[in-house]
Amino acid sequence: MVEHVPFKLKSEFEPQGDQPQAIQKIVDGVNEGKRHQTLLGATGTGKTFTMSNVIKEVGKPTLIIAHNKTLAGQLYSEFKEFFPENRVEYFVSYYDYYQPEAYVPSTDTFIEKDASINDEIDQLRHSATSSLFERDDVIIIASVSCIYGLGNPEEYKNLVVSVRVGMEMERSELLRKLVDVQYSRNDIDFQRGTFRVRGDVVEIFPASREEMCIRVEFFGDEIDRIREVNYLTGEVIREREHFTIFPASHFVTREEKMKVAIERIEKELEERLKELRDENKLLEAQRLEQRTNYDLEMMREMGFCSGIENYSVHLTLRPLGSTPYTLLDYFGDDWLVMIDESHVTLPQIRGMYNGDRARKQVLIDHGFRLPSALDNRPLKFEEFEEKTKQLVYVSATPGPYELEHTDEMVEQIIRPTGLLDPKIDVRPTENQIDDLLSEIQDRVDKDERVLVTTLTKKMSEDLTTYMKEAGIKVNYLHSEIKTLERIEIIRDLRMGTYDAIVGINLLREGIDIPEVSLVVILDADKEGFLRSDRSLIQTIGRAARNDKGEVIMYADKITDSMQYAIDETQRRREIQIAHNKEHGITPKTINKKIHDVISATVESDETNQQQQTELPKKMTKKERQKTIENIEKEMKKAAKDLDFEKATELRDMLFELKAEG
């Protein structure tokens, strides 16, 4: 039985500006059963706070989808703060590193699946699915991995092991049930997904918990006592009358179903081998027979095998080609989906299926997998649409899909800080570089910063060189710059080491810099992805964190995209100015703390204190290994503290260090 718990929003702020009307409109829309709604929220208007208020008012389990792990991590931290008493969960891919299995026919190279699984994220995924079966006050922040195949939710729910004080049950029966749901006995290395036995006491470490295990004490053939215990210290946290243990894997199957699944796999193998041999693909047939029989043997003996997800269509006894189960199936009938940065996230959801299919088809053609492996896949976009009932799209620049499916945009234009969208000035390209240098110098004199966006790498490089020769402290930000260096450049811009940054695509997250008072768009009239109306509005938004924010577009004609961006920005400015005037608000630049660059933590032998250090350019093998260990330690600590941004940056540093080694 799912427990009903109301959402309790904790915040020192009340909705202000146009947040109250946005909240009310979306809540009314959800209650009226509207399928599609769009929150058009300008940069810095508090969209997350509005989303939180909607969830509180509507009171439905909610799935929030973000387009990458970093963004999902930021949202998870924010929603945890807003809803400390409710179940806020995190569901992203549990791979720190993932190389899917693949085959390159031209070089006859098979690449084995190689992955580094993050145990903490695996625990959070289990916590998310089990929460949905226990309570209805659940918010799950997910990346697009939520549309990838997961086990059958009915099977997952039906296979739970329920223990209650006073229940008649032999100890051996509990152990057998735990093994059936893929827990393994380990009396020495006690960790998630294992249990240990000490006389009449069985201790179970649930897959969904981080530091708490369950101690079940027997008296004869009866459960005498159940307690929650800290697995490290042994300290008793609390007594329990009842506890539900969810399976240790989402791909869990009853024994009788496993037998049927194995028969189905054998039948498919037989048919596929005949096909391959008829086509005279003898090497492929031999390879497939060998690999599949090994997997079948593992399933018979262990109930599991490496890459078991490739047999998911058989394990769940679904017809070939049918829609896979995903996280979406773990929600009940009445729930809500919010898609953050929908103009980026929706195209990502749409594109997942085709990319996955192309890679798997090569493996099937060359005898590495059975054709049914195609059914272990992400959802097609049409299937995603079928499975979701009510959606709220959140974006500063909604895409064509949102515009087409939403009757009326819910606008949120006013910033709590009173900051306005920037003024836009269109200037001719003649003498544009000299004019640009003069504008930058003007900002330098006022201790302000500048972002310059160009269309090509060559233009960026040439412009950076020219500006350096003219005495301007400038750096160039491009896609080949590694994560750590990128963070350093942005920090140095804020600190004043640089006056300006030149780049091609400055829309990536992490470029919200309050010190930037001028954004310059070169070649604004060259139509294309980087100069579309949505891209221009996003770029203009980079100057909306400063009360002196201004945008200069250099162009010889005004394109439709430019006109739309200019008109939209002016419309928003007028709304913001009117609101500030009515309420006596003076716009104020955001004061954002400048963080030190994340760098390797080195322990000083004398003081044993942690200190920040720049990564040396050259290191011995031993120094590199020590640095890697320190960064790994710091990364895990950051993840534990829910500082996912920092953890992600440290992870990228690790990849760079390992690649260089």
Swiss-Prot record:
<keyword id="KW-0963">Cytoplasm</keyword>
<dbReference type="GO" id="GO:0003677">
    <property type="term" value="F:DNA binding"/>
</dbReference>
<dbReference type="GO" id="GO:0006289">
    <property type="term" value="P:nucleotide-excision repair"/>
</dbReference>
<dbReference type="GO" id="GO:0009380">
    <property type="term" value="C:excinuclease repair complex"/>
</dbReference>
<feature type="domain" description="UVR">
    <location>
        <begin position="625"/>
        <end position="660"/>
    </location>
</feature>
<dbReference type="InterPro" id="IPR036876">
    <property type="entry name" value="UVR_dom_sf"/>
</dbReference>
<dbReference type="GO" id="GO:0016887">
    <property type="term" value="F:ATP hydrolysis activity"/>
</dbReference>
<dbReference type="InterPro" id="IPR041471">
    <property type="entry name" value="UvrB_inter"/>
</dbReference>
<dbReference type="InterPro" id="IPR006935">
    <property type="entry name" value="Helicase/UvrB_N"/>
</dbReference>
<dbReference type="GO" id="GO:0005737">
    <property type="term" value="C:cytoplasm"/>
</dbReference>
<comment type="subunit">
    <text>Forms a heterotetramer with UvrA during the search for lesions. Interacts with UvrC in an incision complex.</text>
</comment>
<dbReference type="InterPro" id="IPR001650">
    <property type="entry name" value="Helicase_C-like"/>
</dbReference>
<dbReference type="InterPro" id="IPR027417">
    <property type="entry name" value="P-loop_NTPase"/>
</dbReference>
<feature type="short sequence motif" description="Beta-hairpin">
    <location>
        <begin position="94"/>
        <end position="117"/>
    </location>
</feature>
<feature type="region of interest" description="Disordered">
    <location>
        <begin position="603"/>
        <end position="624"/>
    </location>
</feature>
<comment type="function">
    <text>The UvrABC repair system catalyzes the recognition and processing of DNA lesions. A damage recognition complex composed of 2 UvrA and 2 UvrB subunits scans DNA for abnormalities. Upon binding of the UvrA(2)B(2) complex to a putative damaged site, the DNA wraps around one UvrB monomer. DNA wrap is dependent on ATP binding by UvrB and probably causes local melting of the DNA helix, facilitating insertion of UvrB beta-hairpin between the DNA strands. Then UvrB probes one DNA strand for the presence of a lesion.</text>
</comment>
<feature type="binding site">
    <location>
        <begin position="41"/>
        <end position="48"/>
    </location>
    <ligand>
        <name>ATP</name>
    </ligand>
</feature>
<keyword id="KW-0267">Excision nuclease</keyword>
<feature type="domain" description="Helicase C-terminal">
    <location>
        <begin position="432"/>
        <end position="598"/>
    </location>
</feature>
<keyword id="KW-0228">DNA excision</keyword>
<dbReference type="InterPro" id="IPR024759">
    <property type="entry name" value="UvrB_YAD/RRR_dom"/>
</dbReference>
<dbReference type="Pfam" id="PF04851">
    <property type="entry name" value="ResIII"/>
</dbReference>
<dbReference type="GO" id="GO:0009381">
    <property type="term" value="F:excinuclease ABC activity"/>
</dbReference>
<keyword id="KW-0234">DNA repair</keyword>
<dbReference type="Pfam" id="PF12344">
    <property type="entry name" value="UvrB"/>
</dbReference>
<keyword id="KW-0227">DNA damage</keyword>
<dbReference type="Pfam" id="PF17757">
    <property type="entry name" value="UvrB_inter"/>
</dbReference>
<dbReference type="Pfam" id="PF02151">
    <property type="entry name" value="UVR"/>
</dbReference>
<dbReference type="Pfam" id="PF00271">
    <property type="entry name" value="Helicase_C"/>
</dbReference>
<keyword id="KW-0067">ATP-binding</keyword>
<comment type="similarity">
    <text>Belongs to the UvrB family.</text>
</comment>
<dbReference type="InterPro" id="IPR014001">
    <property type="entry name" value="Helicase_ATP-bd"/>
</dbReference>
<keyword id="KW-0547">Nucleotide-binding</keyword>
<dbReference type="InterPro" id="IPR001943">
    <property type="entry name" value="UVR_dom"/>
</dbReference>
<protein>
    <recommendedName>
        <fullName>UvrABC system protein B</fullName>
    </recommendedName>
</protein>
<keyword id="KW-0742">SOS response</keyword>
<dbReference type="GO" id="GO:0005524">
    <property type="term" value="F:ATP binding"/>
</dbReference>
<dbReference type="GO" id="GO:0009432">
    <property type="term" value="P:SOS response"/>
</dbReference>
<feature type="domain" description="Helicase ATP-binding">
    <location>
        <begin position="28"/>
        <end position="414"/>
    </location>
</feature>
<dbReference type="InterPro" id="IPR004807">
    <property type="entry name" value="UvrB"/>
</dbReference>
